[in-house]
């Protein structure tokens, strides 16, 4: 294990930016999503995979094209030097991947997440194969210029509304009236379905819903499907207690009669979750 003292800087060289752009979404890194300090979603990877990407044939092919601005990398030592420049440019930061038992030891307020590993920022960068690092660099959006131009065009279009021809003004008026009509119809349906629900709740055993998925988290068409539905009755607690009470009775009856369960009968097993590192 080699601990390398590194001083970070806000100055970022163009070479470091080009290499970061190549590595950011590279499949060789096999990046995963983790929780930095148990709060922020980040992409993390192992150093050995980054070195593998820098020494790959794909990198050599793209490095041969001078437009990409990539420097030649011959061996692992040169790959380590390039990686150090990424740390100095604050494109990546070293982290520690915490196991379940280590999360509470690091911070009592942190809660383990079943789907995302918890990562803790480290003050030392260990240039070793299984060392973990997190991206703090985001590639520039190639469509940001197009979005900016469209935004300016939209602003000027609204400002110059008095200069629009009459047919465009009439078209916008009809369009706005149509949208307001749809919005009013939506609120009318919501009020009617609420009134129907309250009436059927007081009169019928089960309440009636018009468009039961209207406010559910689904698509526009799915919100109006099905047309109607009935409110599901709540399960009584007595049924649960009777089921739980029947289990010991069956067990005791088996002990009293002396009948043993079949050997091939399915038995419940405890599920043990084990964290496996890649």
Curated annotation (Swiss-Prot):
Compartments (UniProt record): Endoplasmic reticulum membrane
Superkingdom to which the source organism belongs: Eukaryota
Region of interest (Disordered), residue spans: 230-278
Keyword Amino-acid biosynthesis (UniProt): no
Residue ranges, Cytoplasmic side: 1-142, 200-278
Claim: Protein transport is one of the keywords in the record: yes
Assembly and interaction partners: Part of a complex that contains SEC61, SEC62, SEC63, SEC66 and SEC72.
Name this polypeptide is given: Translocation protein SEC62
């Amino acid at each position: 294990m080699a601990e390398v003292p590194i001083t970070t800087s806000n100055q970022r060289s163009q070479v470091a930016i080009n290499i970061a752009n190549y590595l950011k979404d590279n499949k060789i890194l096999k990046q995963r999503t983790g929780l930095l300090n148990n709060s922020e979603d980040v992409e993390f990877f192992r150093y050995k995979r980054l070195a593998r990407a820098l020494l790959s044939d794909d990198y050599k092919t793209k490095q041969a094209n001078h437009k990409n601005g990539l420097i030649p990398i011959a061996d692992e030592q040169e790959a380590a030097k390039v990686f150090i420049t990424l740390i100095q440019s604050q494109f990546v930061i070293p982290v520690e991947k915490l196991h379940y038992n280590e999360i509470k030891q690091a911070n009592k307020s942190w809660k383990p997440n079943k789907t995302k590993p918890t990562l803790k920022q480290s003050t030392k960068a260990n240039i070793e194969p299984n060392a973990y690092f997190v991206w703090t660099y985001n590639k520039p959006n190639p469509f940001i210029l197009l979005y900016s131009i469209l935004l300016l065009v939209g602003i000027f279009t609204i400002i110059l509304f008095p200069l629009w021809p009459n047919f465009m003004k009439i078209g916008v008026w009809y369009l706005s009236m149509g949208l307001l009509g749809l919005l009013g119809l939506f609120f009318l349906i919501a009020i009617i379905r609420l009134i129907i629900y309250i009436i059927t709740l007081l009169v019928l055993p089960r309440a009636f819903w018009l468009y039961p998925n209207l406010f559910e988290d689904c698509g526009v068409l799915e919100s109006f499907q099905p047309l109607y539905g009935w409110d599901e009755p709540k399960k009584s607690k007595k049924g649960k207690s009777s089921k739980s009470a029947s289990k010991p009775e069956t067990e005791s009856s088996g002990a009293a009669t002396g009948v043993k369960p079949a050997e091939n009968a399915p038995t419940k097993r405890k599920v043990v979750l084990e964290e496996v590192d890649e």
